[in-house]
Amino acid sequence: SKKKLEKHVKYLMQEAGLTSREADVARLICTGLSDKEIAKKLELSHHTVKDHLKKIYAKFRVHARAQLVSLMYK
């Protein structure tokens, strides 16, 4: 559920040390949006979203979007 995901993302954000913007990007990834869609929704450049993604992947020690989504829904 959306509420459960939000609670889990907050926990993971604290544990992994995500910034609030990185957490926003992570949340939107979990909803299935593309990088370009995330950029538009958050009013960021596509490049900035990619940078956030790299940092998120590093903090969670994952290498792919599917791994991140799987982790978020655990």
Model-inferred region functions:
Residues 1-17, 36, 40:
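Linker/hinge segments immediately adjacent to helix-turn-helix/homeobox DNA-binding domains
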Residues 7, 20, 48-51:
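Alpha-helix N-cap/N′ positions at the starts of helices
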Residues 29-33, 72:
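Short helix-to-turn junction characteristic of helix-turn-helix DNA-binding domains
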Residues 32-67:
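Recognition helix of helix-turn-helix DNA-binding domains
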Residues 17-18, 60:
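Histidine kinase transmitter module recognition
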Residues 27, 40, 70:
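A cross-family signal for key residues in well-ordered alpha-helices
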